[in-house]
């Protein structure tokens, strides 16, 4: 099956499309005066130049005898006037924006810049063909096997990983497959994922990318991949057998293998900027084809207007850019089999001008109207660096968003730097204060505590400050707002007490994340103590700083077991994957009679439901999240970040008749193993997450009978909280009242 264009465009597909007797080529270049197709050898020398025909701004050529594997590029002739945003320079061989495979490598010592070293206004006339990546003609092949059933996001546990870093050190993967698409598809790797329980992987960028010259000048390379060159081409360096188009089939094989295991594939995509950097950067593709069309420019048209921090910003106000992004996304769904996308710096894609943001932008309208994207996961990183760039909570139905407020608060909570538990209630209930608008469900929030950008979980509990010296910028790069705590020693230590606490804190963060409403996401290796040695900006470290060390799995087996247990618990019950906000909805029996409990409630640990004094207690560290349905299922999840043990009392009837701990982050022997009754006391150790399965009455008659037998002590409400730690001197000021505030009824309840 060949690519097809959006309904807005008629005619043959863009890019290179093989035919019975050769290949057709098509390039959109509305400002070009002439375009040459260059068929080239592996070394960049020219086999043949073909003048293309202008078809209303789309340049076309049909060439007999071309076969799969042929390398090619374009030379675009036109006006050179940098002051007007016009940068045509036919000396520069350009990558096809629709190329489905691209050769690797850029020679930054070669003539790859469209201007001379002496003057930005003077065109460089040297041929770049032997210094730049080349487009490759690719034969069509069947799409990967579809997954048996795409799950709604609330049923997904998302695992952010890197194709190379995840398997490059895996001892069971054959050496020639490590760090490749085939390595990620290897049985031992998939077995790890399925045993852990994750059912969706989010791959750091796999579109063909190149390293920036300033990184390479330091002897490093772009590891993350947020520097895209070609939006249809899988990154060739991740292929085990070559870059003559083989990467396309190997990627498809990987998707098929993951799908057979019930694992969805989500791509992190970077449509907000390209690898060409600022107006002084290299000319590899878009700049030479139509600089003024692809990029946002300053008002005087002389410079790129950058809202991404990467030198340029794509301009989705132009049809050619929207077409490219739309068709690229369709291709990855229909031909490459992916199940979703995470859009890097997504706000850039919905700017109506350099200074404005439009949540009804044509970009979003196109995806909403295209049936190809029905059931496809669309996840926004809902910010960029421009004016009004922070758009968290504003993307509307059909979109989910990375929730940085969850990340920041939960880091503070687990280091006992949060003020009370009001915000905790909102964050673990799906952040209704942010996302309960436009009829959006809790799955709209992608909850995470760590991601590729910043400290990984182990480093969050091992370092108070960043240690980015290896990046070559004197530790100036990377955020200083880490909200981390080293547990008593900076970096690696032999202190058994510090190490035990670090293990426990990682267990807590993973368990709390998985027990929160919304969609959980964590980083590959968190479950086995992966460390970046304190580097919180390891974008340029293609080495053991980033790679997953599989030999840590035994040492951190407790963390793996805890994550596995909580993931299994979450996936076992619809209650723990709920996708609606339960604003104090009473549970009823089959006859419609109220059972005296609610679908969600908040417990204080001594008398039952949280009261006004509990919500106003800035030193409170304990909160119980109670969820129930109309049948016989309920859970009570205790979150406790205090450092000392606390006596906790289970809630009275009608909340439950029995409480059994089914998962916890505590050490063996710290918690009761037997089932507890209502109003039963037990000791909750410091810094713990505990999940209890609750036995509940299912009829009003049962409630009445049980309440007659098990009556709460009359003075229970006057006893006060069992857990009242002193407010941390460094705790932040009282946050805005969230859905958990007593004055507006603790919600979601």
Task: Go through the PLM ranges and name each one.
Residues 33, 199-201, 339, 519-520:
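Short acidic/polar active-site loop segments enriched in Thr and Asp
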Residues 48, 170-187, 463-468, 669-680:
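Short, polar loop/linker segments at the starts of domains and inter-domain junctions
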Residues 162-338, 345-369, 434:
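Substrate-binding/active-site clefts of carbohydrate-active enzymes
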Residues 1-159, 164, 493, 498-503, ...:
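Carbohydrate-interacting/catalytic domains
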Residues 76-143, 212-227, 261, 281-305, ...:
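Core domains of carbohydrate- and sulfate-ester-processing enzymes
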Residues 350-353, 358-524, 529, 537-541, ...:
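Conserved alpha/beta catalytic core and glycan-binding cleft of carbohydrate-active enzymes
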Residues 157-159, 201, 265-267, 341, ...:
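Hydrophobic faces of well-ordered beta-strands that scaffold small-molecule active sites
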Residues 27, 74, 161, 203, ...:
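Conserved, mostly hydrophobic/aromatic
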